[in-house]
Swiss-Prot record:
One of its GO terms (cellular component) is DNA-directed RNA polymerase complex. DNA-dependent RNA polymerase catalyzes the transcription of DNA into RNA using the four ribonucleoside triphosphates as substrates. It holds the Pfam family RNA_pol_Rpb2_45. It comes from Staphylococcus saprophyticus subsp. saprophyticus (strain ATCC 15305 / DSM 20229 / NCIMB 8711 / NCTC 7292 / S-41). This is DNA-directed RNA polymerase subunit beta. The keyword Ion transport does not apply. PANTHER family: DNA-DIRECTED RNA POLYMERASE I SUBUNIT 2 (PTHR20856). Its EC number is 2.7.7.6. It is an enzyme of class 2 (transferase).
Length: 1183
């Protein structure tokens, strides 16, 4: 027997065909969200308050400091926040200290800084009652980048950019005349030496001594028109502030504020780390030949002779000496932009492949520590040196698509940036208030205006591109949404500008970003998913784990190192499937491995690391596809994406052929109820589980407190599907921390269960499965195999209007008793009522405008009392095409103290309607391998082809759907699924390490099936066997969210566009079918004149004709001739607006009056075609 049984959770055993043992548990899959938010609360906020403190007034007398902060208790818990449509948040209180320096007085006060949204345990936020997810953003890391490109003559030109986290960019570039230029903040370019002079290197000789003599520098000095530091400063000022009178002082302060002011310029710790790494001498001197000896300044000993070629070993020795300040120079740049001395380290080396033996100077930035978040003059000099070195052939250009140069901004950092914007706006207000307020009586509370802070947080959660309505179609969709990485958003790329290179799969994605899962369409490659084992480090770079190889024994150790993409470039990594002996040594002498994006074979002694698992390459959703290795990548992409669209079924079932990921994905998705700590289940109900905590101390077990786990019952998810949780533990069970207590939607026994296992045959049947169509047995309808539950929410508000308040009531004008049969005495539908489209859910009347009364009418009113005020019916009705059973009704009243209602609303009624949708012709189905299709026919069970034992099959798929698509995984799944069903087991075939062909065939034989997996099928209609044996097996098939009930639509009469008077478009507007230009040509070609005439007039924009037609149909008369279409009048007006005097003549050359009197005629008849449920907006009008 191939494979061994593995336990997944409490209830499920699977036969696992993996050959590689798991050395590392999968991490918590939503850690990227929770960890980042925790960092924000613990460190990020504090960092922000530290950055902004102290705020001082313009005289320096008042100083405001933020000392500490705390989060209070949320006003409403999670469930209550969802019910009340409020944000799940806690009050943020900040301790503020105000110091009055004149008197030395200190005032401390705790200030309320607004309600701060809290993250739920499952990594989401509840904003205005809706669950939202903050997607992590992939951006270019702040750093120094060097780039090369060919000009039109085929010459290589270099350019460099220093990109900060925030602040001005600094760019270097060369031109055709070999002059090096600098651009400050995207302005016009200046010779590079102008910036050096401005920094304090005033003479040409100083500059040449600093950077080393070369032709590029000489050309640049010739081009440079300045000769002193002051001239250079004025030149820069004129470029940055054209039109303003330049002075040296202004120029100094401008240059200082652009680059050296911590409030204006921020490299961030990641930028400092990357810049130090790039400008560090060690990487730049590798394989270079020294042009001067290196001497240890303390001992006078020569560490490396002139002419030494530096390799890794002697570089390490030299670095130790350099760190002890050898070869370092200090320049005193007093009286310039920065008064501090500048320390650099420089070493002369020979230019590679140069016959004349020229030298160049390599300058490093003398390691500023990680606290220096600004750029320093040493950084600028070192980056210029790197640029000149590149021109001499020393150094490397950067690949901007490499994940070493792209980093993630997760929730915490995005929030921090948003909070910083709010605080800096607040800072301005505080400064202004400081100058106005009386210093004796001022308190911190009076100075602080929290509005900008609250507004910026609200704006971020409510309308940022990265704050998204959670995709809650099923647990996998939730999980994937939380692990999504987007290159779009503020500060990122735009769809239109993103080139092919950015979207493409890069070798550095290995183990960090999934190469499969990305949307099809304009966002392809810009939105990605985190790989299964990946994690994010403190700098925001994605790391992936590797097993360390002991270089002395060449054996794999238990040590696991997480490497970023640029760290990995220094090592040789072996594949996870390399065979090892019992001591952990490689068996083969030559091992398949990766080095810097090349897949190659190297000697086993050269290995540094080994992959931890074959599935570390792919994301959680892709890892749920069995036999992924046998599918074409394009189809695997569709398979991974379509799993997210699977509708939760009424009776879910986990797959016979899984991958072992189903349990982990279900546990971490947030849809299941997971035990917070070890305990014993005391009580289980459908809506609550009670667990008594068990504490172990000194070998004894004690009972602790009681944990309550409420379960969600038949709630509406964000996507309108049914969100229901079912307990899977019993009283008395002892549960461990992290164990699943209750299944969520699309789960069965603690595993993801997106679809059902059905018996599938690959065969044609009367052409009904042409073009990927699916033929299905009626048994699947009858037995509710693919039945799903859908819940829609409708709401109606009673507001205060100018003419008086709206009223929710059963007393509605001009409505028959039968229309009110489902309403209670309040005028609200009762729970359990069955409603169809057009039925009233909430009766509501709105006051009409009262006309001015005559004196006689007023007298009569005074005598006989108030006449009933005129009201119109604005009841909430079931929209077109909806309907079902009323599941729940929620009523919120202002009088009863519901303070969450929006202004002007007195009462809010929410009605939930549930539908049970069976599978239909027209519904979309799919497997897990990108094999999708639409149901074309439901065949009676007795007509379906049947197996030799008489069992009818469930689904017929077209065999032509397999070869051209190259997703062979579905065929292997089919065979293994049938074997698993016959053996009564579940199996796991992990990605890239699953069941081999031999495993599949041996399992088939074990199940007593034919070795080729085919069987004789009999036609259910005739009882005859089909000519050939057919592949029949069990495939896991999903019902997708694209259901025909949501798409089918037909219009009778309805709303019309205000301008063109033509029917609106789309199902939501109850619109018509567009009959466009080409369709008109088709009818013209057929000569169908009358059909064409009625389409262009009555059915479209002949406003008079359509009313008369309706009237004629009602009265049973002949239909009158059509009038003039409104679009013709619009054309006339357009021509008149161009100054053309257009007249319309009849065949006798008499002018036709376009101001038709028929319209007034229609108004007099008052034919009211108003559709009660037609949506009314400014764009629409209803006849």
């Amino acid at each position: 027997m191939a494979g061994q049984f593995v336990q997944y959770g409490r209830h499920r055993k699977r036969r696992n065909y993996a050959r590689i043992s798991e050395v590392l548990e999968l991490p918590n899959l939503i850690e990227i969200q929770t960890k980042s938010y925790d960092w924000f609360l613990e460190e990020g906020l504090l960092e922000m308050f530290r950055d902004i403190s102290p705020i001082e007034d313009f005289t320096g007398n008042l100083s405001l400091e933020f000392v500490d902060y705390r989060l209070g208790e949320p006003k409403y818990d999670l469930e209550e926040s969802k019910n009340r449509d409020t944000t799940y948040s806690a009050p943020l209180r900040v301790k503020v200290r105000l110091i009055i320096k004149e008197t030395g007085e200190v005032k401390e006060q705790e200030v309320f800084m607004g309600d701060f949204p809290l993250m739920t345990d499952t990594g989401t936020f509840v904003i205005n009652g809706a669950e939202r997810v903050i997607v992590s953003q992939l951006v270019r890391s702040p750093s120094v980048y060097f780039n090369e490109k060919l000009d039109k003559n085929g010459r290589t030109n270099f350019d460099a950019t220093i990109i900060p986290n925030r602040g001005a960019w600094l760019e270097y570039e060369t031109d055709a005349k070999d002059v090096v230029y600098v651009r400050i903040d995207r302005t016009r370019k200046l010779p590079l030496t102008v910036l050096l002079r401005a920094l304090g290197f005033s003479t040409d000789q100083e500059i040449v001594d600093l950077l080393g003599d070369n032709e590029y520098l000489r050309n640049t000095l010739e081009k440079d028109g300045t000769e002193t530091t002051d001239q250079a400063l004025l030149e820069i000022y004129e470029r940055l502030r054209p039109g303003e009178p330049p002075t040296v002082e202004n120029a100094k302060s401008l240059l200082y504020s652009r680059f050296f002011d911590p409030k204006r310029y921020d490299l961030a710790s990641v930028g400092r780390y990357k810049a130090n790494k790039k400008l560090h001498l060690k990487h730049r001197l590798f394989n270079q030949k020294l042009a001067e000896p290196i001497v240890n300044t303390e001992t006078g000993e020569i560490v490396a002779e002139e002419g030494t070629v530096l390799d890794r070993r002697n570089l390490d020795e030299i670095m130790d000496v350099l760190e002890a300040n050898a070869n370092s120079e200090v320049f005193e740049l007093e009286g310039t932009v920065i008064d501090e001395p500048v320390e650099i380290q420089s070493i002369k080396v020979y230019v590679p492949n140069d016959e004349e033996g020229r030298t160049t100077t390599v300058i490093g930035n003398a390691f500023p520590d990680s606290e220096v978040k600004c750029i320093t003059p040493a950084d600028i000099i070192a980056s210029m040196s790197y640029f000149f070195n590149l021109l001499s052939g020393i150094g490397f250009t950067d690949d901007i698509d490499h994940l070493g140069n792209r980093r993630l901004r997760s929730v915490g950092e995005l929030l921090q940036n948003q909070f910083r914007i709010g605080l800096s706006r607040m800072e301005r207000v505080v400064r202004e208030r400081m100058s106005i307020q009386d210093t004796d009586s001022v308190t911190p509370q009076q100075l602080i205006n929290i509005r900008p802070v609250i507004a910026s947080i609200k704006e971020f959660f409510g309308s940022s591109q990265l704050s998204q309505f959670m995709d809650q179609a099923n647990p996998l969709a939730e999980l994937t949404h939380k692990r999504r990485l987007s290159a779009l958003g503020p500060g990122g790329l735009t769809r239109e500008r993103a080139q092919m290179e950015v979207r493409d799969v890069h070798y550095s994605h290995y183990g960090r970003m999934c190469p499969i899962e990305t949307p099809e369409g304009p966002n392809i490659g810009l939105i990605n998913s985190l790989s299964s084992y990946a994690r994010v480090n403190e700098f925001g770079f994605i790391e992936t784990p590797y097993r360390k190889v002991d270089l002395e024994t060449n054996s794999i150790t238990d040590q696991i190192d997480y490497l970023t993409a640029d760290e990995e470039d220094s090592y040789v990594v072996a594949q996870a499937n390399s065979t090892l002996d019992e001591n952990g040594r490689f068996i083969a002498d030559e091992v398949v491995c990766r080095f810097r994006g090349n897949n190659t074979v190297m000697a086993k002694e050269k290995m540094d690391y080994m992959d931890v698992s074959p599935k570390q390459v792919v994301s959680a959703a892709t890892a749920c596809i069995p036999f992924l290795e046998n599918d074409d990548s394009n189809r695997a992409l569709m398979g991974a994406n379509m799993q997210r669209q699977a509708v939760p079924l009424m009776n879910p079932e986990s797959p016979f052929v899984g991958t072992g990921m189903e349990h982990v994905a279900a546990r971490d998705s947030g849809a299941a109820i997971v035990a917070k700590r070890k305990g014993r289940v005391e009580h289980v109900e459908s809506n609550e589980i009670l667990v008594r905590q068990l504490i172990e101390e000194d070998g004894q077990e004690y009972e602790g407190e009681l944990d309550r786990y409420p379960l969600a019952k038949f709630k509406r998810s964000n996507t309108g599907t049914c969100y229901n949780q079912r307990p899977i533990v019993a009283s008395g069970d002892v549960v461990t921390k992290g164990e699943i207590l209750a299944d969520g939607p699309s789960m069965e026994l603690g595993e993801m269960a997106l679809g059902r296992n059905v018996v599938v045959g690959f065969m044609t049947w009367d052409g009904y499965n042409y073009e990927d169509a699916v033929i299905m047995s009626e048994r699947l309808v009858k037995d509710d195999v693919y039945t799903s539950i859908h819940i829609e929410e409708y709401e109606s508000e009673a507001r205060d209007t100018k003419l008086g308040p709206e009223e929710i009531t059963r007393d509605i004008p001009n409505v028959s008793d039968s229309a009110l049969k489902n309403l209670d005495d309040r005028g609200i539908v009762y729970v359990g009522a069955e409603v169809n489209d057009g039925d009233i859910l909430v009766g509501k009347v709105t006051p009409k405008g009262v006309t001015e009364l005559t004196a006689e009418e007023r007298l009569l009113h005074a005598i006989f009392g108030e006449k009933a005020r005129e009201v119109r019916d604005t009841s909430l009705r079931v929209p077109h095409g909806a309907g079902g059973i009323v599941l729940d009704v929620k009523v919120f009243n202002r009088e009863e103290g519901d303070d969450t209602l929006s202004p002007g609303v007195n009462q809010l009624v929410r009605v939930y309607i549930v539908q049970k949708r069976k599978i239909h012709v027209g519904d979309k189905m799919c497997g897990r391998h990108g094999n999708k299709g639409v149901i074309s026919k439901l065949v009676p069970e007795e007509d379906m082809p049947y197996l030799p034992d008489g069992t009818p099959i469930d689904i017929m798929l077209n065999p032509l759907g397999v070869p051209s698509r190259m997703n062979i995984g579905q065929v292997l799944e089919l065979h293994l699924g049938m074997a698993a069903k016959n053996l009564g087991i579940h199996v796991a075939s992990p990605v890239f390490d699953g069941a081999s062909d031999e495993d599949v065939w041996s399992t088939i034989e074990e199940a007593g099936m034919a070795r080729d997996g085919k069987t004789v099928l009999y036609d259910g209609r005739t009882g005859e066997p089909f000519d050939n044996r057919i592949s029949v097996g069990v495939m896991y098939m999903l019902k997708l969210a694209h259901m025909v009930d949501d798409k089918l639509h037909a219009r009778s009469t309805g709303p019309y566009s205000l301008v063109t008077q033509q029917p609106l478009g789309g199902k939501a507007q109850f619109g018509g079918q567009r009959f466009g230009e080409m369709e008109v040509w088709a009818l013209e070609a057929y000569g169908a004149a009358y059909t064409l005439q009625e389409i262009l007039t009555y059915k479209s924009d002949d406003t008079v004709g359509r009313v008369k037609t309706y009237e004629s149909i009602v009265k049973g008369e002949n239909i009158t001739k059509p009038g003039v279409p409104e679009s013709f009048r619009v054309l006339m007006k357009e021509l008149q607006s161009l100054g053309l005097d257009v007249k319309i003549m009849d065949e006798h050359d008499n002018e036709i009056d376009m101001q038709d009197n028929e319209e007034e005629d229609v108004v007099e008849r008052k034919v009211d075609l108003q559709q009660k449920d037609a949506p009314q907006s400014q764009k629409e009008v209803t006849d």
